[in-house]
């Protein structure tokens, strides 16, 4: 049975939480000042899951793909910048995720779409349409379909999204949903089987492993005062290497990312806290912000409001986020 949902957001935590409810997980930091606006459309005719998403401010995220899903993604505007695990999503290219892929992504103000399908359905469709089963690649990589084939994918994906938003009752028809789904699966299989793979330099995945070690260390130590030497030791990388990789994968220095990450975790805690039982001081110090005056000034500069105002706000999403914000739920 088909279903769809379209939502808009002004809170990045609520936006990432909504993505996390659709066979993926993402969380991270907004990397620039300004008013955050985002939207997320989720459409599932039956087995295929489509996501249409966009945000107005640059972001750096750490995301994971549901291990049960074979997923691809593409940008919808060639002028924007998107990097997936350090790979630039160039115009008219498709990112094909390995099973249970996870890594850092960075976005300019941008829009992206994704198509996901259970692995067994992709294998079956491959056998039916091209005479061989298709499986997820061992490593996430980019492919470049022919311009007509890529255009076909984009237009079909867009048509399904527009129909789901404007006339969901039409897509609710089993016959209509099945027709769209079969067309989507067919063009997805064509892209996977007929496109040219974009070569990735061999050291790239060693660099991804360095960044994963860094993220794991930061996740395990949210309330510690950390220094660059700590980050280098945890990532098993030299100062120079870590700085270079952070600029490639995160778009910023390691210390800037650490600071932004802690600021966003503090903001998340303020958003879900009970103002009658919790103080700004308690939350700030729990994330190793010991100079409260500097914290308040930096917080207001980054988020456009003092931390006390955030504490008084009701959560945008009524479902509180529990557990680690950087891990895919079981």
Walk through the language-model features, giving the residues of each.
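Conserved short histidine dyad/triad with adjacent acidic residue
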Residues: 33-36, 44, 48-65
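Short, conserved glycine- and acidic-residue-centered signature motifs
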Residues: 65, 207, 259
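Solvent-exposed residues in well-ordered beta-strands and their adjoining turns
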Residues: 56, 75-77, 118
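Alpha-helical bundle regulatory/interaction domains
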Residues: 1-35, 81-222, 227-229, 233-239, ...
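Short, conserved beta-strand element in jelly-roll/cupin
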Residues: 64-80
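Conserved hydrophobic/aromatic beta-strand scaffold that supports enzyme active sites
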Residues: 42, 50-52, 72, 94-96, ...
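Short hydrophobic/aromatic patch on the recognition helix
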Residues: 242, 246, 294-295, 299
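C-terminal flanking helix
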Residues: 250, 258, 262-267, 300-303
């Amino acid at each position: 049975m088909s279903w769809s949902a379209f939502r808009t957001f002004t809170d990045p935590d609520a936006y990432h939480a909504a993505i996390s409810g659709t066979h993926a997980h993402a969380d991270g930091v907004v990397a620039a000042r300004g008013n955050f606006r985002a939207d997320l459309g989720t459409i599932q005719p039956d087995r295929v899951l489509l996501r249409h998403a966009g945000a107005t401010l640059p972001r750096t995220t750490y995301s994971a793909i549901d291990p049960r899903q074979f997923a691809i993604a593409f940008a919808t505007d060639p002028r924007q910048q998107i990097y997936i695990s350090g790979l630039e999503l160039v115009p008219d290219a498709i990112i094909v995720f390995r099973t249970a892929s996870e890594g850092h992504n960075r976005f300019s103000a941008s829009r992206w779409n994704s198509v996901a399908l259970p692995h067994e359905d992709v294998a079956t469709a491959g056998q039916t349409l091209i005479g061989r089963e298709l499986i997820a690649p061992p490593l996430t990589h980019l492919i470049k379909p022919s311009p007509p084939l890529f255009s076909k994918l984009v237009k079909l994906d867009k048509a399904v999204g527009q129909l789901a938003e404007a006339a969901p009752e039409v897509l609710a028809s089993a016959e209509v949903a099945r027709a769209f789904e079969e067309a989507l699966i067919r063009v997805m299989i064509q892209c996977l089987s007929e496109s040219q793979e974009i070569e990735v330099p061999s050291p790239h995945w060693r660099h991804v492993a360095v960044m994963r070690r860094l993220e794991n260390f930061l996740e395990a130590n949210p309330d510690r005062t950390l220094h660059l030497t700590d980050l280098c030791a945890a990532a098993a990388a030299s100062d120079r290497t870590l700085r270079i990789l952070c600029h490639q994968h995160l778009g910023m220095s390691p210390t800037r990312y650490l600071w932004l990450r802690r600021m966003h975790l503090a903001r998340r805690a303020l958003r879900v806290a009970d103002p009658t039982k919790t103080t700004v001081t308690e939350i700030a110090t729990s994330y190793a912000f010991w100079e409260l005056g500097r914290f308040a000034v930096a917080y207001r500069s980054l988020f456009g409001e003092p931390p006390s105002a955030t504490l008084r706000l009701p959560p945008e999403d009524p479902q509180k986020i529990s557990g680690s914000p950087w891990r895919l739920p079981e």
